From Swiss-Prot:
Protein name: Astrotactin-1
Gene name per UniProt: Astn1
Stretches in topological domain Cytoplasmic: 175-388
Membrane topology: Multi-pass membrane protein
Every Fibronectin type-III domain range: 1030-1145
Description of the deletion phenotype: Slower than normal migration of granule cells in the developing cerebellum, leading to a decreased cerebellum size in adult mice and impaired skills in tasks that require coordinated movement and balance. Granule cells from mutant mice have a rounded shape and lack the elongated shape seen in wild-type. At 6 days after birth, increased granule cell apoptosis is observed, contrary to the situation in wild-type.
Ranges for region Disordered: 340-381
Signal sequence range: 1-21
């Protein structure tokens, strides 16, 4: 029965739920479990337009700033995204989630505050008055109906499930209670008929009792109303001739009426069952021997039971029953009150005792049990109770489920341009809400506050404001408040410590058991060689993965796509690199890997690679077994000096013999033989010698690989096979067969091409036979002997370093003389690889190490010669102390060459002008010790080859040891050596090694136009060092000498096409205070050529004079604002795109003495004489005093010199000043004479000092910003014409004594 009721209840509740589910079937199932979500976009345009829109579009404001104050009174996060352009306006996106009734309560307002802050406040409808800018949310009607239907569906389903669970639990509890009651039932003793009659309790309603009886009951009830019963009918039990124990009666009442006996009725149905059982007892006799009285009483009792309203005592029929024993009635009344108290232990708070008739029921347990067995059903719950429970539970479930918790959450997303949010902006969020700055690429220093509610105080969140450097592990806000910091202090978990550089990051200081590092991840700051800059806000993560058992170090400071390198078949490495904006994410990934201080520790973490205790660790043949892990090692290594064979079956010396395991039989025509050769120093180790052999009746050819028949005979004069290869180092034009280094312009030591003499190859004028394939073209005699002499130029070695410049003599001068006789043009028509080069290439087939190919290039060079010129060459360099000496000697040489005799001394050495060369004339002056040969003139000569007899211009007599054959003068055409290789893989690897050797010093790979350096090619500063940075040589200008306040510096701009990109030059200027110790400097200034000089920022003290273009590579720089007679030191560095600096180049020079106008000084000396001559008035004295005081020390020296030179007979200048002006004024004037150095004082005593002015062109540039990484040096001259104008500067010079120019 119970199961049937549960099934009916389940069907009752499931039916409406199914109907609702069907009705709501059109609703999106994904939305059934979500709250209502509404998105609103709010633009800040109205307020920016009305107040200060100009901050967004002002051309003068490149990065406008705006203070924001954003406050959210609802729970929800705040997101800032700077994804807009600078011309776009900021806007807010509100994502409101909640139920239908709460969403319209969300309001917002924007306000422009007086301090220029844009306020955006999200608040409740009742939380703030209606202000301009407030906008409520609106809910469409169709969405509301759909929402109500969905909520009703969820409510019915939830209520049904809760009700079924509750009923199931209740039935189980009652079933357990019933079993407990059966075990506790006590059997009733057998009683007599009188005792059985005594158990019949006669119920007399109180309405049948007289007034006095009712009054006594009222008094008793008033005294103990707190313990009276609450039933609807009052009664007075009367015992019929038997003193029944009220205690036993109460126990029976408890078991029958409260617990229900065997019926195990629920608490809800207990009252109905008690009424049913007690009504059956109402038909019993009320008094002994009076059946009519019983019937009368029962009729009246039933009428009272059926009545629907309380019975008034004034309308009842009063029939009293007399009692003879008042004491007995009193006792029964007291007991009745006790029974009522037991039935209602909580008491009755009502005081209406008279108008509400009450009745207490006492039931016989034994009769109740009988009734239960006969008339009561077995089901624990009847139909009426089941219906009541079902309806009540369904109603409660509907009411409770209709109020599903759906909190109101408002998420704010602020979209702004980059750098718009100014430092000091405020964000006020509800406690528990966060500020999401993950998409805020350029965050500002903002102030964050949290509040418990919209009216609560604000608390500053010191940890949440760490936007620029968020803590990796933990943040302690209390530390920040205690130490008055702007943000909370970062803490680390156990086992970690703070990074010494990045205080907000944590590094591990305790490492557990190493589980292997693969993938092995490292991170550090790198250098972006693609963009040509060093990122300051990025950390590069480099992840190395295991290839086939071995890890190789790669470059870790470059930014390129993942590259895969194959060093040998058993060792590969692939690196995947990711650029991370956030260092914390890099650190978190790194924490999962292991830490290694060195490569050896990394390799040792894998444990022994082999067990070498038995069978040589499994290594074959002459391999050595090692247990320690090493780079490029699988545990089997070759002995020192040996290399693994192609099939890795053994080790051999690749420089000797062949490799029989290369898949081509070692290049042998018939047999490839192997022989074991033990090492003399260690007999346990041996080398595998492999060589070619021939079968019977065949012999090995001269090439060591081919085989020839032994019985084969060559006809007379015939050609039997290939002729023997002849070494070409002793052959005419033999350099054509050797390698060539096109950087050093030198011939390599290794012979690349094979030279044979099978053909009769002879050239005109040469008696020796030439190698095959060599074409020789002779040059006519009239074009063979040519003389060249250069213009005299300042010695470049004198202009750099410590320059001992003298304004008296000027620059020393250098002149070059050369005679060249080109006799033959040589061209190589056919090229055959020599045996030595072939063996070297064959030994490298399949090799993957770049170092092996670089060693081959060092031996054989990186190019081979195709065309060259041969002949004779003699050159001489002549140094002069100054330009005047060179000019005088050259004029004398021209007179002698024309037949003129300037002196007797020169007539003795006069020769035929056709054969007299300028070096011979200089040498004759030096040998004779003539006086015209000035001190400091010297000459050095050298020659290549022996001068032919047909050339009369040779100066140096060749020694007998000099060969008579022509020598190599110049290589006119050369080709890369890798073009001679036929194996595609070897050719590719050799080409990569050639490029690496030419541009990356052999320690890096060429990637387009830059070098990717190996891990070993980085300096202590972390910068790559594989690509050599050319050193610019700083020198004084060869055209413009230094003046008293100006110096012109110049250097050659040199930038290789691959590996190095020069982006700037740095010039440091220092003033030396100690002439003996140049390390003591007073001031120091560092200038950038790009940022300070060509931009015009340092004009007029630093200006460009000449910049590179497509024809010229010289850079000239004018340094002004210098002090006369002062030593300055200038240092130059070249800077490339990785931040490297070249080796410095210095120039130390002393500026000349102050320039003086000697003509003006002589005029002033005449004027002073006229003022001092005769009577000198006060006005004349003052005029003389003012004139002399304003001259300055250099001019005053020349005035003194000219005055004493012409007017000393009238009195010396010093004495005349003291006599005419007085000691005090004369002392002030004459004290200026001591301001100059002794060197300048001596120069100012020269009889003749002339003033000349030179013109110096320079570029007057307007200030402009030039990006160094976009600088094109070849187009720099054209680009500067847009912002610079060519102007002329007049520079004064003094010539002491005779003029320098003749």
């Amino acid at each position: 029965m119970a199961l049937a009721g549960l099934c009916a209840l389940f069907a009752c509740c499931w039916g409406p739920a199914a109907v609702l589910a069907t009705a709501a079937g059109d609703v999106d199932p994904s939305k059934e479990l979500e709250c209502k979500l509404k998105s609103i976009t709010v633009s800040a345009l109205p307020f920016l337009r009305e107040n200060d829109l100009s901050i967004m579009h002002s051309p003068s404001a490149s990065e406008p700033k705006l203070l924001f104050s954003v406050r959210n009174d609802f729970p929800g996060e705040m997101v800032v995204v700077d994804d807009l352009e600078n011309t776009e306006l900021p806007y807010f996106v509100l994502e409101i989630s909640g139920n239908t009734e709460d969403i319209p309560l969300v309001r917002w307002r924007q306000q422009w505050l007086e301090n220029g802050t844009l306020l955006f406040h999200i608040h409740h409808q009742d939380g703030a008055p209606s202000l301009p800018g407030q906008d409520p949310t609106e809910e469409p009607q169709h969405e509301s109906a759909e929402e109500e239907l969905r909520i009703l569906h969820i409510s019915v389903m939830g209520g049904m499930i809760a009700l079924l669970l509750s009923i199931l639990c209740l039935v189980m509890i009652l079933y357990t209670r019933r079993r407990w009651c059966k075990r506790r039932r006590v059997p009733q003793p057998q009683k007599s008929a009188s005792a059985e009659a005594a158990n019949e309790i006669h119920y007399i309603p109180s309405v049948l009792i007289g007034g006095h009886g009712r009054e006594s009951l009222r008094n008793a009830r008033v005294q103990g109303h707190n313990s009276s019963g609450t039933l609807s009918i009052r009664e007075t039990p009367i015992l019929d001739g038997y003193e029944y124990d009220i205690t036993d009666l109460r126990h029976h009442l408890q078991r029958e009426c409260m617990n229900g006996g065997e019926d195990f009725a629920s608490q809800v149905t207990r009252t109905l069952d008690s009424l049913q059982g007690c009504n059956e007892k109402s038909g019993m006799d009320l008094t002994p021997g009076s059946d009519n009285a019983k019937l009368s009483l029962m009729n009246k009792y039933k009428d009272n039971i059926i009545a629907t309203s309380p019975v008034d005592s004034n309308h009842q029929q009063a029939t009293l029953l007399s009692h003879t024993s008042s004491s007995q009635r009193k006792r029964i009344n007291n007991k009745a009150r006790a029974g009522s108290a037991f039935l209602n232990p909580e008491g009755d708070s009502s005081t209406e005792a008279e108008n509400d008739p009450q009745l207490t029921f006492y039931t016989d347990p034994s009769r109740s049990r009988r009734r239960s067995r006969v008339g009561s059903p077995r089901s624990p719950v009847n139909k009426t109770t089941l219906t009541l429970i079902s309806v009540t539970s369904c109603v409660i479930g509907l009411v409770c489920s209709s109020h599903v918790s759906c909190p109101l959450v408002v998420k704010i997303t602020l979209h702004v341009p980059e750098h718009l949010i100014a430092d000091g902006s405020r964000f006020i969020l509800l406690e528990g809400s966060q500020l999401d700055a993950s998409d805020w690429l350029n965050p500002a220093q903002v102030v964050l506050f949290s509040q418990q509610n919209s009216s609560g105080p604000w608390a500053m969140d010191l940890c949440a404001r760490r936007l620029l450097d968020p803590c990796e592990h933990q943040c302690d806000p209390e530390t920040g408040r205690r130490e008055h910091r702007a943000a909370g202090e970062c803490l680390c978990y156990e086992g970690y410590m703070k990074d010494p550089v990045h205080k907000h990051l944590c590094i591990r200081n305790e490492w557990g058991t190493n589980q292997g590092p693969w993938p092995y991840t490292i991170f550090q700051r790198g250098f972006d060689l693609v963009l040509g800059e060093q990122p300051s806000d990025k950390i590069f993560r480099f992840t190395y993965t295991l290839g086939e058992g071995m890890w190789l170090p790669l470059s870790k400071s470059f930014v390129i796509p993942p590259a895969e390198l194959a060093i040998n078949p058993s060792a590969k490495c692939k690196t995947d690199m990711t650029v991370m904006e956030d260092a914390v994410e890099v650190r978190e990934e790194l924490m999962t890997s292991s830490s290694f201080d060195s490569l050896e520790v990394l390799l040792d973490s894998f444990g022994p690679v082999r067990d070498c205790s038995k069978d040589n660790g499994g290594c074959s043949k002459n391999f050595r077994c090692i247990s320690d892990r090493k780079l490029d090692s699988t545990g089997c290594v070759c002995p020192s000096g040996l290399s693994p064979m192609k099939d890795s079956s053994g080790c051999y010396d690749r420089h000797i013999g062949v490799d029989c395991s290369d898949g081509f039989n070692g290049g042998c025509e018939q047999l490839c033989l192997q022989q074991m050769a033990p090492f003399p120093e260690d007999p346990t180790l041996y080398n595998i010698l492999m060589f070619c052999g021939c079968i019977e009746d065949y012999k090995l050819g001269v090439d060591g690989r081919s085989c020839q028949l032994v019985t084969e005979t060559c006809p007379e004069g015939g050609d039997c096979g290939e002729s023997r290869e002849v070494p070409m180092n002793q052959t005419l034009f033999g350099e054509m067969f050797f390698g060539y280094n096109n950087q050093s312009k030198e011939v390599a030591t290794g012979q690349v091409l094979k030279g044979t003499f099978r053909q009769n190859n002879f050239a005109r004028g040469l008696d020796q036979q030439l190698p095959d394939g060599l074409v020789v073209a002779s040059v006519p005699l009239e074009n063979q002997c040519l003389e060249e002499i250069s213009e005299p130029t300042p010695d470049p070695d004198f202009l750099t370093g410590m320059v001992n410049f003298s304004e008296v003599s000027g620059y020393p001068v250098l002149q070059h003389w050369k005679v060249r006789s080109v006799m033959y043009h040589i061209k190589l028509n056919q090229a055959a690889i020599s045996q030595a080069f072939s063996n070297a290439l064959h030994s490298l087939d399949g090799a993957t190490s770049r170092a092996d190919f670089v060693a081959l290039l060092d031996q054989f060079g990186n190019h081979y010669i195709q065309e060259a010129v041969y002949g004779f060459e003699e050159s001489c360099s002549i140094w002069y102390p100054n330009k005047q000496v060179q000019r005088r000697l050259w004029l004398e040489y021209e007179d002698i060459s024309k037949g003129n005799s300037p002196s007797d001394e020169s007539e003795e050495r006069e020769r035929d002008p056709k054969v007299l060369t300028f070096p011979e004339y200089i040498a004759s002056l030096s040998d004779s010790g003539t006086k015209r040969m000035a001190a400091g003139v010297r000459m050095e000569c050298q020659s290549k080859g022996r001068c032919p007899s047909s050339c009369p211009l040779c100066h140096v007599t060749s020694s007998p040891e000099t060969p008579a054959e022509p020598v190599l003068l110049e290589v006119t055409r050369a080709s890369p050596i890798y073009e001679l290789v036929t194996n595609n893989q070897t050719q590719r690897l050799l080409q990569e090694a050639t490029m690496s050797s030419l541009w990356c010093s052999g320690t890096g790979d060429v990637i387009e136009d830059w070098c990717r350096c190996d891990s070993t090619a980085f300096g202590a500063d972390g910068l790559p060092t594989c690509a050599p940075l050319p050193q610019p040589v700083l020198r004084l200008s060869t055209v413009h000498e230094p003046s008293s306040n100006l110096v012109v510096l110049e250097w050659e701009h040199s930038e290789p096409p691959i590996g190095v990109q020069i982006v700037d030059y740095l010039i440091r200027q220092e003033k030396v205070t100690d002439r003996m110790d140049h390390s003591k400097v007073e001031t120091e200034t560092v200038l950038s050529f790009v940022d300070d000089i060509i931009s015009g920022a340092k004009a007029p003290c630093a200006m460009p004079s000449q910049v590179p273009d497509k024809q010229l590579t010289t850079i000239s720089l004018i340094i002004r604002c210098l002090e006369p007679d002062t030593i300055y030191m200038f240092t130059l560095w070249g800077v490339d795109n990785t931040g490297r600096r070249s080796r410095p180049s210095d120039v130390i020079v002393k500026t000349p003495c102050p320039v003086v106008d000697d003509v003006k000084a002589q005029e002033i000396a005449d004027k002073i004489y006229n003022l001092f001559n005769g009577y000198t008035s006060g006005k004349e004295q003052q005029t003389a005093y003012n004139t002399l005081l304003d001259l300055g020390s250099p001019t005053l020296h020349r005035v003194l010199y000219h005055y004493n030179q012409h007017y000393e007979s009238f009195g010396e200048f010093t004495w005349r000043c003291e006599d005419e002006l007085g000691p005090r004024k004369a002392g002030l004037i004459l004290s200026q004479l001591g301001d100059l150095s002794s060197w300048c004082n001596g120069l100012l005593q020269e009889p003749k000092i002339s003033l000349r002015r030179g013109s110096l062109k320079y570029l007057g540039c307007r200030y402009s910003e030039i990006k160094p990484y976009g600088l094109d040096w070849s187009e720099l001259s054209r680009d500067l014409r847009k912002t610079c104008e060519e102007q002329t500067l007049s520079v004064p010079y003094n010539d002491y004594g005779d003029s320098k120019d003749i």
